[in-house]
C-alpha cells in the first residue's frame, strides 16, 4: 500500500511477491515454535531454545533477515525500491513518505529482532513446560520452511529485473503505468546506504535492550508507567475499534435480527405458516373421535348438503 500510494505500482507488486516468501516462512516458523512449546504463543514464556530447535532457528533467522530488509536478501530489494521511489518523487509528500518509510523499516527491524531474540536467546522462561520437553518439529513441518527460505533468500535478486528493472515494461506489457522521469533518475549514495545501515544497527540494539540489559526496560516500566501501559495496550486501538465499529455493528445487527428476522420474516414466514398449519390440523383432529355414529352423522350431513346442491341446480 505504501508503494501504491506513491505511484510505484510495479514495486508494490514486486514487494508483494517477495513478501509472500519470507512472511509465510515466519508464519510457519512461528507454528513450529508453538508446536515445540505445546501451543504456547506468548514469547515472554519462551527463550533459550536455539539448540533445541536448530532447524527452526535457522529458518526463522532467514525469515527475520529478509523481513527486515537485510542486504541482498529478498526483502532488501523490494523494501529499498519502495523507499527510493518515494524519494525520487522529489516533492514534500514524497520526502515525507520516504522519511516515514525509513523510520518504519527501522522499527520493523527492532520488533522483528525482539521476537527472534526473546524466542530463541536469553534464559528459558516457561514455568509450565520443562525445557527438555521442547523439541524440533518433524520433517513434514520443516520441509515447507526449507523451500520458503530459498525464496526468501534468492527471489528478490533473481526477479528484480523482471519486476522493476530497465526492461520491466516487457514483463508488464502496458498493464502498469510508469513515470519515466522517475524511473531513470539517480539517487545519492548516502540515501542508498541509510536504510541498510539502520537495519544492521537494529540487530545489536535489539539484543542489547531485550537480552543483555533487560533491567533498562524494567526501569522504564516503573518510571513511565502510564506510557508503558499505553504502549502495552497497543495505543488502545482495539478498544477504540470496539467502540467505533464493533459495538455499533452488534447493536444494528441485533436490531435487524429481533425486529426484522424474528419479528417479521419468521413471524409471517416459516414460523407463522407452520403455526397456522398446526392449528388447522388440530381443528381437523377434533372430527376424528373414533366413534362410528359420529362418522355416520358427518356422512349424513354431507349427503344432505350434496343433495340440496343438486336439487337447487
Residue positions per predicted region:
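Membrane-helix interface motif
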Residues: 70-83, 87, 157-178
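Hydrophobic, small-residue-rich alpha-helical packing segments that form membrane-like cores
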Residues: 1-88
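Divalent metal-coordination and catalytic microenvironments
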Residues: 19, 46, 75, 116, ...
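Hydrophobic core segments of alpha-helical transmembrane domains in multi-pass membrane transport
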Residues: 64, 68, 105, 148-155, ...
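Alpha-helical transmembrane segments of polytopic integral membrane proteins
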Residues: 27-30, 39, 70, 79-80, ...
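Aromatic-capped, Gly/Pro-kinked transmembrane alpha-helices
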Residues: 165-197, 208-313
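Interfacial and helix-entry/exit segments of alpha-helical transmembrane bundles
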Residues: 37-73, 95-104, 129-154, 228-229
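Predominantly late transmembrane helices and immediately cytosolic-facing juxtamembrane segments
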Residues: 23, 27, 95-133, 169, ...
Amino acid at each position: 500500500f505504501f508503494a501504491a500510494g506513491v505511484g510505484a505500482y510495479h514495486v508494490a507488486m514486486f514487494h508483494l511477491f517477495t513478501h509472500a516468501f519470507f512472511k509465510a516462512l515466519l508464519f510457519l516458523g512461528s507454528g513450529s515454535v508453538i508446536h515445540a512449546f505445546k501451543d504456547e504463543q506468548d514469547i515472554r514464556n519462551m527463550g533459550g531454545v536455539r539448540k533445541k530447535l536448530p532447524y527452526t532457528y535457522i529458518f526463522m533467522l532467514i525469515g527475520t533477515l529478509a523481513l527486515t530488509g537485510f542486504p541482498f536478501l529478498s526483502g532488501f530489494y523490494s523494501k529499498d525500491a519502495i523507499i527510493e521511489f518515494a524519494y525520487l518523487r522529489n516533492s514534500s509528500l514524497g520526502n515525507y513518505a520516504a522519511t516515514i518509510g525509513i523510520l518504519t523499516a527501522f522499527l520493523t527491524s527492532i520488533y522483528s529482532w525482539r521476537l527472534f531474540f526473546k524466542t530463541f536467546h536469553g534464559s528459558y522462561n516457561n514455568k509450565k513446560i520443562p525445557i527438555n520437553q521442547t523439541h524440533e518439529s518433524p520433517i513434514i513441518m520443516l520441509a515447507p520452511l526449507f523451500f520458503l527460505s530459498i525464496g526468501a533468500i534468492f527471489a528478490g535478486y533473481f526477479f528484480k529485473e523482471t519486476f522493476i528493472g530497465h526492461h520491466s515494461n516487457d514483463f508488464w506489457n502496458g498493464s502498469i503505468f510508469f513515470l519515466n522521469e522517475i524511473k531513470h533518475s539517480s539517487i545519492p549514495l548516502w540515501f542508498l546506504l541509510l536504510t541498510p545501515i539502520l537495519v544492521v544497527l537494529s540487530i545489536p540494539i535489539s539484543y542489547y535492550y531485550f537480552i543483555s540489559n533487560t533491567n533498562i526496560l524494567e526501569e522504564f516500566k516503573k518510571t513511565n508507567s502510564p506510557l508503558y501501559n499505553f504502549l502495552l495496550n497497543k495505543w488502545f486501538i482495539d478498544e477504540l475499534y470496539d467502540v467505533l465499529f464493533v459495538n455499533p455493528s452488534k447493536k444494528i445487527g441485533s436490531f435487524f435480527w429481533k425486529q426484522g428476522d424474528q419479528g417479521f420474516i419468521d413471524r409471517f414466514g416459516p414460523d407463522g405458516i407452520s403455526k397456522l398449519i398446526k392449528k388447522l390440523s388440530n381443528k381437523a383432529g377434533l372430527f376424528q373421535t373414533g366413534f362410528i355414529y359420529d362418522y355416520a352423522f358427518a356422512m349424513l350431513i354431507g349427503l344432505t348438503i350434496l343433495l340440496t346442491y343438486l336439487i337447487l341446480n
